[in-house]
Each structure stands twice: as structure tokens, then as C-alpha cells.
Amino acid sequence: MNKRIITIILALSAVCSGAVAQPKVSGRVPTREKRGYDQQIVIDTASVRVLYALNAKDIKDENTYIDLGKLEVGKRVKKYSSEFIDLSDEEAVKWKKKTGHTGYVPKSFWIGGRPELHENWSELVFSDYFIRGNQLKEYACFPLWAERENSSYTEPWPLMQWTLADEQQTILGHRCQKATCRFRGRDFVAWFAADVPIKGGPWKFGGLPGCILKVYDVQKIYVWEAVAIERGTYQIMQYPDKLYPKSTRKSVWQRQKKYTEDYLNAIGWTSLEGRPTPPKIHFEPLEKE
């Protein structure tokens, strides 16, 4: 058997069997070209952005994050996406210009986050969320060998109905108030700063009278915490629509769940040695329904 094929098979098996300990990541990192990393267009300019650590083991160390997310606030659009992915793509573009390379870019340009997860795909990391008025649009990128599933959909925003509480805490020097809600099968706790006039937060969170600086489900499977509020001039970029055909939230959600729980079977992988694929992993989706 070709040694390269054996290596790929073993690597894929290791990824899926090791994903049990970290149910929020699975599959393999998709190719940049299929994401359209070098075809993005500028749709707005942000003057402020908020950076969030996702599931940090040490909030002071980016190398312990699953992701460093960012909320960019423009005049017409708000966007939540991965800063780690954007930084990695910027380095890849620089390298292509410097070397004149015209083929696929090596995956070694990944910047930030837990080193053991650099080869893994996560539906949260590899999705961009755009908010225009009262509408949210997700551009969902799927893992390696499933990029044909890349899709987009829209839904109303915000959909969360919050209950305010009296508790307060300080985050990044801002006095934050507690709020709670139940959303698509999970109970969430958010801490928002009324003195930061941004009605939004990480992922799809919003609907509070101030910027959400910390939010988590009550089981703390998913935890976002703001690590910086930055002011400057930031271009808000968008992938080309042609690479992300229109779909529905339910369809995207079902497919993201499928590729996370059972990646090898989902991509139609078959062992050349006749070995069975690893069992499904236990996955706790952010949206349960």
C-alpha cells in the first residue's frame, strides 16, 4: 500500500479517536482555497472590535484557547469570526506574493490556539456570522473533503429573550450586569457592559442593552470571555456568495452535527485494510435544536 495513503489513514483515525476528550472539534481543517480566503471583498469598515477567548484554559495565554474570536462593528454590518483564521490567512497571502506560489497553500501557516487542535475543524471556528439590522447570516465552512457542503443561511436577530439579574462583576475594567436566557435547548448566562454601546457579542449572542463581554452555558461547555476592546480602522471582509450556496439553519446545523460526531463515515471514508471506522464521538452542540 502507498505509504502516503497509510499516513493519511492513521492520521484521520487518530484525529477522530482523540476527539472524544474535546467534543467541540473534529474532522480536518478545510483547504483555504475552498473557503475562498483570497477572494474576500470589503463590505464595511469597523472602528471598534472586541476580541474573545473561546474555552481558554488560561485567559492570559492565547495558546490555551480553542479560538480567539472577534466582533467587528461597522456602520452597516457587525461580523463575528475567528481572528486566528484571519491572521493565518494574512500570512498565507504574504507568502504567496513573496514566493509567487500558485498552488494550494500549506496548512503550516496556522497561528494561535492550542497546538494540538491546529489540524482540527470546528463548526464555531470555521463559520463567519454577519449581522445587518435585524438579520443574521452565517457562512458555514465544512471540514476537509466535505467543503462541497459549504453553505449560508439567514435568520432573524436577535432571537434571545433575556432576564436581567442584580449581580455584577468587572470585566476589562467595565462594570457588567448579569442576564440569563434559554436558547435552543441550552441555558445561558451573559455579562454585559451598558457603558460599551454595542448591542452584540460573540457568535449569535445579542439583544442586551450593551456589549456582552462574557457568556457561557450553565454547564460551561462553551465559554466566551472578552480579552480586549480595540479601536482603530478594520476592514470587514466577506467570502464570495458563490462559494456558499443558500441553505437553511436546520440543514446546516444537521450537517455540522453529522461531521462532528462521525467525520469518517460522513465523508465516506473506507479503510483499505478493512478496519472499521472509529465509533461516533460524544458531541454537545451549542444549539441543541
Predicted regions and their residues:
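Extended soluble regions of mature proteins
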Residues: 23-289
